[in-house]
Structure formats: C-alpha cells, structure tokens
C-alpha cells in the first residue's frame, strides 16, 4: 500500500523565502518533506545501483525539487543526477539546470529553435573583442558573464574605452564575457514569467530603482503583476520547453519587434512574484509535482514506501564492498 509520498528539497537555505514556501505547500499537499543541503550529501554507485547518503544514512525519496544556487551549479547538478538515476521524479533535471545556467549555450539553443533573443556574442580572448564590439554595432551595449544569477556581473557600457577596460578585467579574473545588444525601449524594465510544465502560472514586470538599469527584485527593483500578450506567453512557454525546464523563471524584454528572451532561471525566486501577483506560485509548483507522483503510482511504476532497513548505513555499504573485494 502506498502512503504519503516523500519529497526532498535541495537547498542550502532552509530559511529562505522560496524554500520555506515550497516546504509549507508540499506538506499541505501531503508530502513528507525534508530540506537537505546538497553539499552535505554523499553519493555511491555499486553493483546494486546508485545510492545517496546524508549524515551516514541512505536517502530514499519519491520526488526532488532542486534549489541549486549558482555557486554550486556543477556539484549540485551531480547530486540531482544521482537522484534521477535512483528513479526519483525531479523538477528540474540536472541537464536542464546546467544548460540554463550557461547563458551562451542556452541562447544558442533558443535561437536555433527560432525563439527571439538579443544579438549576443561570446568572446574567448581580447583578440576577438574589437570585432565583437563592431558586430554589435552601437553603444550603449551590455556586457555580462556567461554564468551568473540575479543580475550579478551585468554591465551597461556607453563607449568603447570602458567596454575594452571591463572586458580585460573579466578575462583577468577568468570570466568568459558575453557582449549583447542593448534594447533601449526596455531600459530598466523586464518581464519575469513563471512557467510550470508548459503552462504560465504567473507574470510580472520588474522595474529598476533610480539610475540602475538592472531590474532584479533582489537589487531593489519594484515589481507589479502584468497580463501577458499571447505572443509573450507563447515565447515564455517555448523557452522553458526548449531548455527542458519543468519549472522556469523566464526573463524577457519588450522590443520594438516583440518579446526577446534573455534567459530562463531553473530556481526562480518566489517572493517578488507572489507578492506582486497574489498568486500562490509555490502551490502551483508542488501541485504539478504531486500530479506527476500520482501518475506514476497509477501506472504502477512507483514501489510502495518502505522504511530504511536497519544496518544500511554508509558504513555497512563500505563494509560490504570491502568483503566482496
């Protein structure tokens, strides 16, 4: 007999707004929920398959919500992949997280699928910078790091000298810069859309504070609910789908030619958009995951919950491997 499904929320900040909201709603939807720091997890692979340990004991779960911060993208994604191998239902997969965090790779995928994106150039060395700046063609322009979140390492440059100086500093720090066209008509404004399994559940416009051109909520920008046009909604859904994201915060700019996709965030913050829209976004995410668990149970692909057997600690796993060797 199947009892309440188990959920692991991978987060380094159990007290963060988004993590607390997801925990609250998951418990309301009947999940037995644990919040675990992904960097406190150990993994093992042997003849019996993939295993995950926390504080010396194995983790058994039916579903996972990864809230993987930028600074632990690669090791965190490795943990997510291990859960996938163990058969857990994961919102979002490791591959989708890695792709969405790589701005140039994500832009390439979206452009190849016909999605509208700003003109963007990735430069590998200072030798390529002058040609890239000429290709963009006009100032001001945007320079950003190829990886980053919440508006970090994003700059607006209004002349060539400052652009060259910034690019040189980024290379010295081991960063790979992206040079991007500036969309004047959307200065200091962008649109954040939350997409959950192919459906828009909430949307807002973000406006920068004062002279700041970055509109991120965590940088002090203001937010308000907006109604998307059919074109904006279609573009947001397609962007999430093409990047393989079950849950995405899609950022778009309004240009004279229509919406342009900037990026899609695999761990979108919930505070700004829940406050702006009054929509229970956390519940929409958890409800979607609960439906996936229900589908698997009905298909007979999910075994009944079982208690962790005595003696299955990581120490016993290592002892059994030594004995078999």
Task: Identify the function of each model-found stretch.
Residues 2-12, 19-24, 55-59, 81-87, ...:
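Active-site nucleotide/adenylate-binding loops and adjacent lid/helix of ATP-dependent enzymes
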Residues 10-14, 67-70:
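Structural motif
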Residues 12-38:
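Short, charged N-terminal beta->alpha structural module
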Residues 173, 212-261, 283-284, 288-302, ...:
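A long amphipathic alpha-helix within ATP-dependent nucleotide-binding catalytic cores
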């Amino acid at each position: 007999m199947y009892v309440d499904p188990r959920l692991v929320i991978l987060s380094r900040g159990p007290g963060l707004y988004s993590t607390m909201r997801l925990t609250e709603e998951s418990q309301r939807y009947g999940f037995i929920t644990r919040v675990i720091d992904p960097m406190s997890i150990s993994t093992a692979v042997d003849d019996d398959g993939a295993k995950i340990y926390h504080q010396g004991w194995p983790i058994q779960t039916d579903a996972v919500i990864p809230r993987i911060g930028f600074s632990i993208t690669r090791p965190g994604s490795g943990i997510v992949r291990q859960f996938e191998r163990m058969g857990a239902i994961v919102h979002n997969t490791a591959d989708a997280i890695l792709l969405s965090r790589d701005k140039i790779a994500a832009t390439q995928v979206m452009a190849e699928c016909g999605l509208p994106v700003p003109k963007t150039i990735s430069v590998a060395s200072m030798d390529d910078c002058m040609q890239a700046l000429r290709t963009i063609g006009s100032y001001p322009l945007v320079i950003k790091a190829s990886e980053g979140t919440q508006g970090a390492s994003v700059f607006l440059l209004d002349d060539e000298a400052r652009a060259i100086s910034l690019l040189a500093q980024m290379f010295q720090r081991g960063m790979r810069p992206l040079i991007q066209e500036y969309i004047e008509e959307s200065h200091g404004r962008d649109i954040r859309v939350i997409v959950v399994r192919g459906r828009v559940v909430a949307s807002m416009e973000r406006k920068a504070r004062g002279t700041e051109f970055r509109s991120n909520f965590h940088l002090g920008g203001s937010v308000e609910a907006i109604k998307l046009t059919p074109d904006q909604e279609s573009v947001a859904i397609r962007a999430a789908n093409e990047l393989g994201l079950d849950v995405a915060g899609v950022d778009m700019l309004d240009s004279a030619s229509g919406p342009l996709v900037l990026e899609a965030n695999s761990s979108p913050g919930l505070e700004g958009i829940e406050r702006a829209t009054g929509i229970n976004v956390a519940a929409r995410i958890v409800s979607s995951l609960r439906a996936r668990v229900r589908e698997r149970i009905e298909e007979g692909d999910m075994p009944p919950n079982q208690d962790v057997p005595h003696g299955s600690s990581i120490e016993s796993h290592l002892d059994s491997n030594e004995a078999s060797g």
